Amino acid sequence: MKVFCGRANPTTGSLEWLEEDEHYDYHQEIARSSYADMLHDKDRNIKYYQGIRAAVSRVKDRGQKALVLDIGTGTGLLSMMAVTAGADFCYAIEVFKPMADAAVKIVEKNGFSDKIKVINKHSTEVTVGPDGDLPCRANILVTELFDTELIGEGALPSYEHAHRHLVQENCEAVPHKATVYAQLVESRRMWSWNKLFPVHVQTSLGEQVIVPPSELERCPGAPSVYDIQLNQVPSTDFTALSDVLPMFSVDFSKQVSSSAACHSKQFVPLASGQAQVVLSWWDIEMDPEGKITCTMAPFWAQTNPQELQWRDHWMQCVYFLPQEEPVVQGSPRCLVAHHDDYCVWYSLQRTSADENEEVYQVRPVCDCQAHLLWNRPRFGEINDQDRTDQYAQALRTVLMPGTICLCVSDGSLLSLLAHHLGAEQVFTVESSAASYRLMKRIFKANHLEDKVSIIKKRPELLTSADLEGKKVSLLLGEPFFATSLLPWHNLYFWYARTSVDQHLEPGAVVMPQAASLYAMIVEFRDLWRIRSPCGDCEGFDVHIMDDMIKHSLDFRESREAEPHPLWEYPCRSLSEPQQILTFDFQQPVPQKPVHAEGSMELRRPGKSHGAVLWMEYHLTPDSTVSTGLMNPLEDKGDCCWNPHCKQAVYFLSTTVDPRVPLDGPQSVSYAVEFHPLTGDITMEFRLADTLN
């Protein structure tokens, strides 16, 4: 059956109705899931297996039957481990139907159908009794309900319900316990992901400073955690103000509460500085003795950094304090971890929690609009003074006496730069209510509410009256649009430029004047694992899961790229960067598709995992801003990526199909096409010897 789905097209800006298979959302969820990454997590799998063996042995040693409840079974892997370890029976709970169906097949393929019952329900809907899903309560509870924040996938309510209704009192639990750790740091780089810094502009009248509104200064920020690969943040980018502090633990073998709570930890600052950011991670102990431990600690907090396990389904957390606060070396303070049933947040106190009335009991929520409009990388981009200087320098070359400027980008400071650098009149278009309110506040804080005109409209709806009857001589964009996911989605600027063509004077300047799509073949250190089939996992055949993911990729994304922030995922270039397509913003969007095909020579040995694609914006003939590679490639091909943008990754067949040989091909062929009607870019990259 087909269904019609309405979607906003991020490139053209139009609402489209697409005919989709009724299961398209299932396929999308499977294709973009972390199942493959989890199966490749050797450390996780081994530790779970060890913990399950130990738990089954403890129950058997007491002369009891080992009855296992596995919540969130996924592939059924942990249940199969339990049966192999000697469990008498397993009840495997999986709420996602396609996954539950796959688990049934995997369990059958491995010969465990007589010992494992897969139940397609949410665990809170599972019943116990003669006519229930379970005939009696289980005495071993096995779960993998954790995310980077530990509790973000509803682990606490699920455990709370399981202990009340599904498992015996004092049951064995794998994992047995989790502990959340935190470290207070000062970091200008990370703080720039949360607050707007003053922006400095050199003008003919001297230095002008764009200041943030007081509402942004006071705002506690976005309520959500920022999860990143913290191992890719150099230790030179932050100063530790505290030791690593164990903030709180959860014993999964006993009754768990999902009620809101706070946990205070006193510490003595290691250095004086501005307390801004809390870095956090967790570990899980698989056994009561704490001998079998799986940790998410970054390299500097590891006892054996050389044995660091890469994983993407669990990373580390960056939390921002509501406000930065000075701490003094040697003067004790308290760090407080707060949590409700799904979220964690932090506050800093002078004394213990019961003596301080200013504890943030309620989760911080943005009230300034900026954190709703700008994500963390966007804050970093706006705070990048070198980038601002490049735009300012380009503006100086195109601004003329009497310039009438129109700025088209979401929540951009370019309109302020244009004003300070001498534009006679500046208009800026803000199509969303959030960006309109935010920019009003920024203009007011800088006493520019009468100097820069904000128009709350989509560009295609602009009228001559909106522009006070004037013709635009400079059309300006970064471009940045909040709805963009892939690098080329910001080509919406080109569509906006086309729709305002009637308002441009003859010979009007457009900045950027053009854009180019670049591609490069790379070998990833680790990212390839998220799309690589597993085959065998700890002795269990999971090919069915591999096939399921491949089918979903073929259904939806086999010819698509996916966005990844590659500064977090090291890779080596195997080819030189190659310009694939160019888009001339001086001209309207063409009517006919733009096609390019060719090949990329592999200049370095390695495994061709994928093609990375990014956009470069040519502000002027002499100034280009890259959303991808930031520096020329080093001899070994190590890449330095723009940290404020996500790049697009097209995984090659060598990654998703192990039958394709990794070595041998000397080039990669490509065919890329831009479709003006939809704004889509379709592509195919193939190793030279897989063309037939």
Swiss-Prot record:
Name of the protein in its database record: Protein arginine N-methyltransferase 7
Stretches assigned to coiled coil: none
Q: Which UniProt keywords apply?
A: Chromatin regulator, Cytoplasm, Differentiation, Methylation, Methyltransferase, Nucleus, Repeat, S-adenosyl-L-methionine, Transcription, Transcription regulation, Transferase
* Keyword flag Transcription regulation: yes
Provide the assembly information. Answer: Interacts with CTCFL, PRMT5 and SNRPD3. Homodimer and heterodimer.
Question: Catalysed reaction per UniProt?
Answer: L-arginyl-[protein] + S-adenosyl-L-methionine = N(omega)-methyl-L-arginyl-[protein] + S-adenosyl-L-homocysteine + H(+)
Does the record carry Hydrolase as a key word? no
Per the record, residues carrying Omega-N-methylarginine are: R32
Q: Which PROSITE patterns match?
A: SAM_MT_PRMT
Q: What is the top-level taxon of the source organism?
A: Eukaryota
- What EC numbers are recorded for this enzyme? 2.1.1.321
Q: What is this protein's gene name?
A: Prmt7
Which Gene3D superfamilies has this protein been placed in?
Hnrnp arginine n-methyltransferase1, Vaccinia Virus protein VP39
Which Gene Ontology biological process is one annotated for this entry?
A: peptidyl-arginine methylation
Q: What else is known?
A: Confers resistance or sensitivity to DNA-damaging agents. Down-regulation confers increased sensitivity to the Top1 inhibitor camptothecin (CPT).
Domain annotation SAM-dependent MTase PRMT-type: ranges:
14-345, 358-684
Organism of origin is: Cricetulus longicaudatus
Stated role: Arginine methyltransferase that can both catalyze the formation of omega-N monomethylarginine (MMA) and symmetrical dimethylarginine (sDMA), with a preference for the formation of MMA. Specifically mediates the symmetrical dimethylation of arginine residues in the small nuclear ribonucleoproteins Sm D1 (SNRPD1) and Sm D3 (SNRPD3); such methylation being required for the assembly and biogenesis of snRNP core particles. Specifically mediates the symmetric dimethylation of histone H4 'Arg-3' to form H4R3me2s.
Query: Any idea which residues are catalytic in this one?
Result: E144, E153
Please give the SUPFAM superfamilies that the UniProt record associates with this protein.
S-adenosyl-L-methionine-dependent methyltransferases
